[in-house]
Structure formats: structure tokens, C-alpha cells
């Protein structure tokens, strides 16, 4: 009987961890992203029904990130203290309930006497609070399993759920709106919110039975596998620092990371919340066709993001790959506006812009985890994600205001 070389044994263990965690976490993130951005499809008819302006929609789409910003760090610290399994489950169930309640925006407006736009703002704000901590919580959870040099591939696979949420969700959203409108007295966009909220609640309950809080609790790992994983994390921990929150917030690197992430997010969410409308304005009228074109764009983005991220990891060079991806993405986003009369040229440039954003984002998240540990990485990841995600407020809001102005 031959014995595998240590590096081969190590690769097998990490492959086992990846196959156990990433498909499930990716599915959770896919649903999170779908519930966050399905408002882009609902917008196609919701604005007329609720008599809302483009600017009001842009503000409401973005105000999600204000709630997200305010509660992100407390949520991630709670996850670090309470445990990933329970806290991720809590996040998913509560955001599913709030997302489903978006269907009753008009009803709440009639009951409270508030304007529909005001109710829309509050529900989006509450959705941000409910979802706060999920993505950095999952990043923190990956830090419990992978040393930093292995994280970029795991994060790239996780982030592939972003475009895949559109690949899967866009045709489904189009089909729901085209097939369910008027059923049971609900409009097409109301059915969209109701049906797409249910998976978050189901998966949230599933988290309690599927995930463990860490390596030691994982019955699916042999004792030797657990020792190997813990040894690799302990070896890397010697080069990291567990900062107090006060020291962390005064660390220059934290705010550089945050500024970079904010700019990436502005472009990514500018695309995500407006792509169905961008496609519609090039002359496409069928909701199902808009869904399929959106799906095609994000499928190509997902493939490019994974391929380029793996190339960066193989070459052990992430900074220039991330910088080049962000620069190319920004350039293509600008070019998409110059060819807005052509559906396929617009989609081609937006696809490259989306891929650039995803690549830079995937590679970016391996940087903070390489210098922080413990509560420091929990607070640091949450701080970067929460402040950086304010770009998700500014991007959609500015696009909405510009659309009304133009």
C-alpha cells in the first residue's frame, strides 16, 4: 500500500472541505443576492403600480445598504461570539420574511397613510438590517477553515453565486412575472417577492442541520484531517495580529481596503440593480427575453471571474490581477453607455464590466484575511464590507437621479 505525499493528502482534505462547504454556502449566497436585487425586475412594473419615480426607486434600492452598514459589525461580532451555525440561520430566516413582505408595500402604505415610496424605503432599510452580517459572516467562517493563501479560490467560487443568481434567477423572475400576474389577486411583482423569499427561509432552517461551528464540531472529518487543518491555521496565525476594535479602526490599511471596496461596489451594484432596465431601453420588450439576456450576461461573467481568479492564484499574483480587472471593468461600463442603441454591444460591455468587478472583488477579499485574525478579522471584514457597501447606496441612487434628469 502506497502512502500519499503530504501535499497530496493536504489537497484531498481541502478538496473535501470545499465540496462540503462551498456548494451549500454558495446556494445560500445565491438566494441572498437574488432577494437583494430582484427588485430590479420588480421595478419594471412596480413603479407604475405604486406611482414611484426612478429617483425614488434608486434611493430605495440603495437604502438597503444603509441598514446593512449600521448593523454589519455588530452582526459579525455576534457571529464570532455565538457561533456561525445559529447566527447565519437567524440572518437567512429574518431576511426571507422581510423580503416577502415587500409584496405588500402598497397595502402597508394604505394601512399607515404613508406614501408607497416611504414604505418602500423602510422595507429596503429593514432588509439591509436583516441581511447585515451574512456575507462577511460567511467570509469569517471560511477563515475558520482556510489559510489566507487558499481563500481567494474559495471566495471566487462563493462570489460566482452573484452572477449565477441572475443566471438562474433572471429567467425565473421573468417567468414568474409573465405567468403569475393577476393570480389570486396579486400583481406580477408581488408574486416575484413572495415566491423568491421562500428559499431563504427553507435554507436558513437547513443551516442548523448542515453547518457546524468549526473544525472540531465536524463529524464528517477524520481526526487526522482535523489536525491537519488546525495545524495549517496555527502556522499562519503566527504572522497575523488580533487587533482590538479601537486599534483596528485607527489602522490605515483598513481604510485603504474600505475605499477600494466602496469603489468596486458602486460599479457592481450600479449594474445589478439596473441591468434589466438597461436591456429594456435598448428595445427588448418581452420580460422573458430580458430575463434570458440578463442570464447570459451573468453566466459569462461568472465563468470569466472563476477562470481569472484561478489564474491569479496559480501565479500567486493577486494585486495586479485585481487592479487590472477593476480598470477594465470600469472602462467597459463607460463604453456600454456609448453604445446604448445596440442591445448586444451594450450587453457585451456590461458583461465585461461585471466580470471585472467580480474578479477584483474575489481577489480583494484574500488581502484583509492575510493580516488579521480572531476578533480582529471578524470586525475588520465587517467594517470593510459595511462601509464599502455604501457604494451600493450611492451607485443605484446616482443612476436613478441621472435617469430622471436625462
Predicted segments with their positions:
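Cytoplasmic helix-loop-helix junction between adjacent transmembrane helices
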Residues: 123-160
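Glycine-rich segments within core transmembrane alpha-helices of 12-TM secondary carriers
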Residues: 153-181, 199-200, 385-395
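Primarily marks hydrophobic transmembrane alpha-helices of the MFS/SLC 12-helix fold
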Residues: 88, 120, 321-322
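C-terminal transmembrane helical hairpin of 12-TM major facilitator-type secondary transporters
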Residues: 316-367
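Interfacial helix-cap and linker-helix signal at transmembrane-aqueous boundaries
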Residues: 46-47, 78-79, 172-184, 279-280, ...
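Helix-to-loop junctions at the C-terminal end of transmembrane segments
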Residues: 71-84, 303-317, 403-404
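C-terminal ends and interior cores of transmembrane alpha-helices
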Residues: 93-114, 327-341
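Extracytoplasmic gate region of multi-pass secondary transporters
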Residues: 39-40, 246-305, 361, 365, ...
Amino acid at each position: 500500500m502506497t502512502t500519499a505525499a503530504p501535499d497530496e493528502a493536504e489537497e484531498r482534505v481541502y478538496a473535501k472541505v470545499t465540496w462540503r462547504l462551498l456548494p451549500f454556502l454558495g446556494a445560500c449566497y445565491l438566494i441572498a443576492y437574488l432577494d437583494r436585487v430582484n427588485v430590479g425586475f420588480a421595478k419594471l412594473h412596480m413603479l407604475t403600480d405604486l406611482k414611484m419615480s426612478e429617483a425614488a426607486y434608486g434611493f430605495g434600492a440603495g437604502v438597503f445598504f444603509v441598514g446593512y452598514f449600521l448593523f454589519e459589525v455588530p452582526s459579525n461580532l455576534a457571529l464570532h461570539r455565538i457561533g456561525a451555525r445559529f447566527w447565519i440561520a437567524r440572518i437567512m430566516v429574518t431576511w426571507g420574511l422581510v423580503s416577502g413582505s415587500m409584496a405588500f408595500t402598497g397595502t402597508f402604505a394604505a394601512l399607515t397613510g404613508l406614501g408607497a415610496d416611504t414604505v418602500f424605503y423602510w422595507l429596503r432599510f429593514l432588509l439591509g438590517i436583516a441581511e447585515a452580517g451574512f456575507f462577511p459572516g460567511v467570509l469569517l467562517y471560511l477563515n475558520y477553515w482556510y489559510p489566507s493563501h487558499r481563500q481567494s479560490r474559495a471566495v471566487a467560487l462563493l462570489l460566482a453565486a452573484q452572477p449565477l443568481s441572475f443566471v438562474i434567477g433572471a429567467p425565473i423572475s421573468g417567468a414568474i412575472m409573465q405567468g403569475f400576474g393577476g393570480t389570486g389577486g396579486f400583481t406580477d411583482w408581488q408574486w416575484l417577492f413572495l415566491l423568491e423569499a421562500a428559499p431563504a427561509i427553507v435554507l436558513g432552517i437547513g443551516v442548523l442541520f448542515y453547518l457546524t461551528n468549526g473544525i472540531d464540531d465536524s463529524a464528517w472529518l477524520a481526526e487526522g484531517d482535523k489536525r491537519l487543518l488546525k495545524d495549517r491555521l496555527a502556522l499562519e496565525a503566527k504572522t497575523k495580529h488580533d487587533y482590538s476594535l479601537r486599534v483596528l479602526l485607527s489602522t490605515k490599511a483598513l481604510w485603504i481596503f474600505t475605499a477600494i471596496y466602496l469603489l468596486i461596489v458602486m460599479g457592481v451594484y450600479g449594474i445589478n440593480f439596473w441591468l434589466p432596465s438597461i436591456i429594456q431601453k435598448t428595445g427588448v420588450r418581452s420580460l422573458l427575453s430580458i430575463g434570458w439576456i440578463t442570464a447570459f450576461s451573468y453566466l459569462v461573467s461568472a465563468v470569466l471571474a472563476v477562470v481569472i481568479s484561478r489564474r491569479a492564484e496559480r501565479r500567486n499574483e493577486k494585486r495586479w490581477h485585481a487592479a487590472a480587472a477593476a480598470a477594465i471593468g470600469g472602462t467597459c461600463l463607460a463604453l456600454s453607455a456609448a453604445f446604448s442603441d445596440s442591445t448586444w454591444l451594450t450587453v457585451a460591455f456590461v458583461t465585461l464590466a461585471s466580470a471585472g468587478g467580480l474578479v477584483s472583488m474575489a481577489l480583494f477579499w484574500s488581502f484583509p484575511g492575510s493580516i488579521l485574525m480572531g476578533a480582529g478579522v471578524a470586525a475588520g471584514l465587517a467594517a470593510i464590507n459595511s462601509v464599502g457597501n455604501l457604494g451600493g447606496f450611492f451607485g443605484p441612487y446616482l443612476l436613478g437621479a441621472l435617469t430622471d434628469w436625462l
